[in-house]
Curated annotation (Swiss-Prot):
HAMAP family: URO_D. This is Uroporphyrinogen decarboxylase. It catalyses: uroporphyrinogen III + 4 H(+) = coproporphyrinogen III + 4 CO2. It holds the Pfam family URO-D. It comes from Francisella tularensis subsp. mediasiatica (strain FSC147).
Length: 344
């Protein structure tokens, strides 16, 4: 197995950085769209281990990447807890009966029953890990981000229902977050048992929170998960909060091994605020891939020059969020080739 990705979490400074892409198995690839067309709905595809493996392999077959990520979705846990999940074209994920009260929370399945409904994810991990020669990244949504969809019922610009519960009924909110955290610990451990070499916790909506509420309603539970996972098995864990650059000082002493960085700050700024000892992952603006070949190469060169100038810390080159579905696959090749060229 190529271990450059895992080596980034070691103490030795690497000669070159590993690279992978958030949502690298996705709609921007025509081969992904061909597989997706075989299934009536997205979750049916997620439940098919062979399909998950096939689409996870697509980017590895096209590009020189140092890691794969299991093909799944962050909302597998809420669905396993008994919530009715549908993916609606033009809207995205929708829960028909969102959490609004303690009564709604009481209707959810137990942790044991919920975990038993997620075997299809572990099967996808096992099938994919046995088919690749690079590390496989497992993942989950953070409790706060999962709760955002479970309470709001769908994505939202303002998440008013979510934030209303946080302020008006914090006890109920914490009850939901704790249950999600307890399930997530087992969920990640099962992914590792099935073949994941590291895990990532995506906190997509943590960035909407004020600092103190981020600490109490989001980071607290991510740290709880990371500590409990590491008590069982010491694997690399990466925290990523979209829009979370204001929280770096709070994250630097937590149990994660790496921190995802979006494009709202430079890697230099992130390193200064997080300090030494954590791997930084990121942080290209996904939209930079709309640019010309020359502009892509120039942007890559600037980031690689900084990475090489830091003699103490390792970096994982990635986008600052998931790749957009209308990106030209050839632009991705330009980016990766430039990363390899300028890292040589």
């Amino acid at each position: 197995m190529r271990k450059l990705f895992l080596d980034a979490f070691g103490e030795k400074k690497l000669d070159k950085p590993p690279v992978w892409i958030m949502r690298q198995a996705g709609r921007y690839l025509p081969e992904y769209r061909a597989v997706r067309a075989k299934f009536d709905n997205f979750m049916d595809m997620c439940r098919n281990a062979d399909a998950c493996c096939e689409v996870a392999l697509h980017p590895l077959q096209r590009y020189d990447l140092d890691a794969a990520i299991v093909f799944s979705d962050i909302l597998t846990i809420p669905e396993a807890m008994g919530m009715d999940l549908k993916f609606i074209k033009g809207t995205g994920p929708v829960f028909s009966e969102p959490i609004q009260s303690q009564k709604d929370l009481d209707k959810l399945k137990s942790i044991e029953d919920s975990i038993g409904s997620l075997d299809y994810v572990y099967n996808a991990v096992k099938t994919t890990s046995s088919a690749i020669n690079v590390p496989l990244i497992g993942f989950t949504g953070s409790p706060w981000t999962l709760a955002a969809y479970m309470i709001e019922g769908s994505g939202s610009k303002q998440f008013n229902k979510l934030r209303k519960m946080m302020y008006a009924n914090p006890q109920l909110m914490h009850s939901l977050l704790q249950r999600l955290a307890d399930i997530t610990i087992i969920y990640l451990l099962e992914q590792v048992k099935a073949g994941a070499s590291s895990v990532m916790i995506f906190d997509t909506w943590g960035g909407i929170l004020p600092l103190e509420h981020y600490k109490n309603f989001s980071l607290k539970y991510k740290e709880y998960i990371a500590k409990n996972v590491k008590q069982k098995i010491n694997i690399p864990i990466v925290f990523f909060t979209k829009g979370g650059s204001n929280f770096f000082e709070e994250i630097k002493d937590k149990s994660c091994d790496g921190v995802g960085v979006d494009w709202s700050v430079t890697l230099k700024q992130a390193r200064h605020r997080i300090g030494v000892g954590k791997v930084l992952q990121g942080n290209f603006d996904p939209a930079f891939l709309y640019g010309s070949k020359q502009s892509i190469r120039e942007t890559v060169r600037a980031n690689i020059e900084f990475i090489q100038s830091d003699k103490l810390n390792n970096y994982i080159v990635n986008l600052g969020h998931g790749i957009y579905p209308d990106i030209d696959p050839d632009s991705v090749r330009v980016m990766i080739d430039a990363i390899r060229e300028f890292s040589a």
